[in-house]
Every structure is written in structure tokens, then in C-alpha cells.
Amino acid sequence: MVGHSAQHRSKSSLVSHLLILLIFITIIIEMCLYNKIFKNQRSDDIRDNFNNGGHRVPSNVQNHGTHIRDEAFISGVYYSNWSPYKPRFHFPHDINLKQVSHIYYAFFKINSRTGGIENTDSWSDLEMNLYKSLAIKNSELIKESSNNSVQNILPLGCIGELFYLKNTCSDKKFKVIMSIGGWSDSENFKIIIKDDKLLQNFVDSSVETMFRLGFDGIDLDWEFPGNNESEPRGYLKLVRMLRLKLNSLESQIFGKRTEDHFQLSIAAPAFKDKLFYLPITEIDQYVDYWNMMTYDYYGSWSETTGYHSNLFSETELNGNFAMHYMIDRFGVNSRKLVLGMAAYGRSFHIKDNKFEPFNQNTVLINKIFKGVGKPTKEIDKADGKEGIWPYKNLPKIGTIEQYDPKYVSAYCFDEKNSIFISYDNTKSVKTKAEYVTHNNLGGGFWWESCGEAYANESRSLINAFNEGLHFNVSSKPSIFQDVRVKKYYLNKYGDGGFLSPYLKHLDSRKQ
């Protein structure tokens, strides 16, 4: 009995050890597989926590600033309302509408006395008749554009033409967003955030103007809130109120929560010293996209020469740093970040021009410079701005275009006059498109449309960028394509709305 009992205990002990070993192995396997199986879910949860920033979002705002289900990418351009004038003579119908998803119309200004927003150029915005030149360019529109009865009801100005184009361009759907502010009007943001009455009037006026003129959303361009407590917090309050007002308009039109949505975006600084003081995580709850201005890293204000729209560098002045700062520090969803690119170059007159014969290995950055180059007929013809070169006129006559793959920037150098110009070209924007897809960003945009090489497809920045995206560009239609929006507009404004005659014409054409 003693021997049998010992043998039994031995077998029991062996079984126990095997069970313990099996449990241990199971735990190890589960730990190894956990990260692999649940990594994405955990990342989403962490990202959501960062986005909420520990603050509960009001029920009528929740998720309304995060419409990022579209798997396609943004390919957008800013169009300025001074573009139709000399020396640019650039009109909305000159944009390659087949290749863009968003056009940001710049700019509306703030009335500092009332808080309301106003046109910066009423003639360009609402009165200029562009249909004759449009009809000449695009023969398929000649019939309607030359029809006198129809011509009298077409909305005028650049804004009117853009609305017309997004209702007639069958090849590609795109949105037009109203941009408020800009560098020259940013001081007025500081005024309205200090006065609740002015701020409320700004919000009401912005949404009213956006809808009355047929825009698909609002883009805020405050350059830039101060590095203090009051202005960043005031910006947060402004954005929150604006999103609530847009939500209210959506509820009146659609009656309930819907995917149909007026977009709210921010043209954001891409410098650490500006981003650091902004309540990004809290603002992020209310916006759809951050248009990151990842350009103008170097210019006339700099101490040395540099690439002004580079993707990488040894310093923090580059697009890659700005994108990852938004993601890693503030927890912004990468799909809400839109990479900014420049359709222009910045020039420098290098002080030390004692180079060996210039070649692609010649170092032209981090050099002392004396101005940005004297005005020449070439510059005057280009844009009239010293130191600014529209991409379509680059490389400079007499130079050879170069490309720096380390920084992802193009440049050219005029040896005779010691002028160095940095800019984006087809190589750099295609690399940036690959960067966008690799990092799952929201897309890209350009400041501004007049610099694009529309006449030469092989030099087109937009075409090269879209090619890098494998032409996976968003084609969501304007919110004004929805019959409910048109009906609400006509009920609200009757025959007196800016778009009323044309909207009635569209309805009659469908019947």
C-alpha cells in the first residue's frame, strides 16, 4: 500500500506539473498574440482618449467634427480672389477641376466693429462676369453660357462661377470652402474673441454667409494666436461656437443626425513654437481637417538660406516634424491632417558667391544672404512680389532644376546673379504623396492655385501628387447637390438669394 501510494503521488505530481506547464505556455502564447490581435483596437482606444482630452463633448457636438470615413484623399487648392487681376489673370475655370477635391476660397475679412464677416473684393467675389471666357475655354458650356435667358440668372463673380462649375462639371465632384482671415486680417480675430457680442455676431455672420453664397464649409485662417493663455482659449471658444452653429443649420435642413455635413477646417501653423500653446486636443473635437501650412520655413525673415517647403531636415523646420508633433503630442487622428505644399518658390541672394563651378553637390542652404533678389522683369511678369516665384515660371530662365532627396525639395541656382530658389516640383510632391499614404494622412493642399503649371501636364504638381496617391482622390459631391439643401435655401431666401434664380433653373431642368 505504501509503494502504491507513493507511485500514485508521483503520478499526481507529474500531472500537476504538466498542467502548470501547460497553463504557463498558454499564458505566454496569449501575451504574444494579444498585441498582434488587439493592437489596432487598443491604438484606436488610446487615440480616442487623446482626442477627447479628458473632456466630455456636448451631445450635439459629439463626433460632428470627425467626418473622416472617406478612405480617399484630399487634393485641394486655395484660390485667392485677387487672382483674376494683373499680372495673374487666373480664373476659377483655369483650375483642373478633374483633379481636385476641395477649393478653399480666400479670403473673407472680419469687421472689427461689428464682428460680422465681409467680402474683401465684392467685384471679384460677386459681380465679375466670367462666363464668356469660360465658354470660350470649354466648348461644352457654350450653349448654356451663350443663352441670354440663362445667362441672366447665372451667379456672378468668382464665387458664382465656382458654384456653377460644381453643378456642371460631370467629370469630377468637388467642394468649395469659404476661408476667413489670412495673414492681413488676423489681428481682427484678437478683437472679436474679447467681446461675447462680437464673437456671437462673427459666428452667426460666418454661417449665414457660407450658406447664402453656396459654400460647403468654413476654413479658419488665423495667423496666429499669440503665445499666451487668452488667445488660444479664445480660439477654442470660437471654433466650438462655430461648430455648434453649423450643427444647428444641419439639423434644420436634415432634421436628424446625418452624414451630410458642412466642413470646418483650420489652416494651422506648422511650427512647434506656435502649435505648443494651442489647445489642439480640445479644438480637434470640433474640426474635420487641419490644413497644415508646411511651407514658408525659410524666407526673407530668416538668418540663413534654406528650403522653404521641405519634408525633412536636421531641425524642427520641416513637414514631417509638424505632422508627427500633431499626432504624437496631441493625439490628432492622422486622417485629419492635410499636408501643405507650395505652388511657388522663395529666392535668396546669397552673399558668399565664391563657389566652385556649380553642380548638384553644391551646398546652397545654411548660407548668409543679402535680400531675396532684386526685382527684375522676370519677377514682375511672374507675380509682382520680390522673392516669390510662381512654380509655373520655374526653374528660372538659364538655370537647371535640381532635386535634394534628403530634404525632399527642388531648387535652382542662378550662378551669374547668385540667386538660389527653393520650391516643390513633381518629384517632391510625388514623394510627399507617398508619405501621405504611408502615414495615412488626410491628403494634401497647395497655396495657391495660380502657381500651378496647368498648361504643361508633365510639370503639373497636382497631377504628380495624385499619381503618387494612385489617383485615390476624394470625389464627394457638394452638399448643395442634396435636394433638401436646395429646398431649404429657396424656402429661406425666396427669390432674393444670391443663388435663388440659378437653383430654380436647375430644378426646372430636371423636371
Curated annotation (Swiss-Prot):
Pfam families linked to this entry: Glyco_hydro_18
Gene behind the chain: CTS2
Additional comment: Present with 3050 molecules/cell in log phase SD medium.
Protein name: Sporulation-specific chitinase 2
SMART domains given in the database record: Glyco_18
GO biological process: chitin catabolic process; polysaccharide catabolic process; sporulation resulting in formation of a cellular spore
UniProt keyword Glycoprotein present: yes
PROSITE patterns, per database record: GH18_1 (PS01095), GH18_2 (PS51910)
